[in-house]
Regions:
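Glycine-rich phosphate/adenosyl-contacting loop at the front of the ribokinase-like
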Residues: 1-41
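Active-site cofactor/substrate anionic-group-binding motifs, chiefly glycine-
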Residues: 31, 35-89
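Glycine/small-residue-rich loop that forms an oxyanion/phosphate-binding "nest" at active or ligand-binding sites
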Residues: 69-118
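Conserved phosphate/ATP/ADP-binding segment of small-molecule kinases
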Residues: 101-182
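Short pre-catalytic strand/loop immediately N-terminal to key active-site residues, enriched for Gly-Thr
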Residues: 186-196
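Conserved post-catalytic alpha-helical subdomain immediately downstream of the catalytic base
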Residues: 196, 205-248
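Charged C-terminal helix
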Residues: 230-273
Length: 273
């Protein structure tokens, strides 16, 4: 089923506007290129509306938040809404500071998001203020496991229904849900957590998939999550004893670049709830 979503990205090569963080911006741009789309990484408030206008989708990531980019995110998000473009929110570290949490709430209040993608602690913070974010990582107390999966799926569906956005909660088990349906995805490898920015790259990848698949936000987001996880598996299989997390990062991008829609279809590991 996900082969079609990936094939559309390669066929349409959509232009995606990313207002992302300075730690991972280069990797995010390369991830968008690897999947077959084109990135623009513009974050000055004086031009974001113009850039959003010439693009077909927007990815907002609050990882290295500052007062200058908050204005840029709000302006770009509102312009994307006016144009009917899909918008992704990656609320990196929501709950870790008042600025991050308040900005995430303001973005949710003023911008209509197509997909909200974060770890379980970040998404819990957005939903209720109850997440226990550990920096930009999910706290152990929040993490999704087989034992609490039913509750996590119900939570994701409820938050999706409340916001009108597809909710993508990523971790050892990924959940991608709208108000009625959820994909529980088991692709990926534990070593992905040793790389800074795999979540940021996934949000950029999700924006590309959304932009190429209008009207299918749930399936597009689930396809992107499966693709990223499968890339982590493929990349890990290439590692030698002398390779570390830097090599692994490059191999993940290579795996997306070389992945075919048929490989994604065959390698996606998910169930529907």
């Amino acid at each position: 089923m996900f082969a079609e979503q990936f094939a559309n990205v390669r066929a349409k090569s959509p232009l995606v506007h990313n207002i992302t963080n300075y730690v991972t911006v280069n990797d995010c741009a390369n991830m968008v290129l690897a999947c077959g789309a084109s990135p623009i990484m513009a974050d000055d408030a004086a031009e974001v509306e113009d850039i959003t206008t010439i693009c077909s989708g927007l990815n907002i990531n609050i990882g290295t938040l500052n007062s200058r980019t908050i204005e840029s995110m709000l302006k770009a998000g509102k312009k994307a809404n006016a144009l009917g473009h899909p918008v992704v929110l990656d609320p990196v570290g929501a709950g870790a500071s008042a600025l991050r949490t308040e900005t995430a709430y303001r973005l949710l209040d003023e911008v209509r998001f197509t997909v909200i993608r974060g770890n379980i602690s970040e998404v819990k913070t957005l939903a209720s203020g109850a997440g226990t974010t550990k920096g930009v990582d999910a706290d152990v107390a929040d993490r999704v496991t087989e034992e609490n999966l039913d509750g996590a799926v119900a939570f994701a569906k409820a938050f999706a229904a409340k916001t009108g956005a597809v909710v993508a909660i990523t971790g050892a088990i990924d959940i991608v849900a709208d108000g009625a349906k959820a994909y529980c995805i088991r692709n990926g490898h534990p070593m992905m957590s040793a790389i800074t920015g795999t979540g940021c790259q996934l949000s950029a990848l999700t924006a590309a998939f959304l932009t190429a698949n209008p009207g299918q936000p749930l399936e597009a987001a689930a396809a992107a999550v499966c693709a990223m996880g499968l890339a982590g598996e493929i990349a890990h299989a290439r590692l030698t004893p002398l390779d570390g997390n830097a090599t692994y990062r490059n191999y993940i991008i290579d795996a997306i670049y070389n992945m075919t829609p048929a490989q994604l279809e065959e390698g996606a590991k998910y169930e529907v709830r």
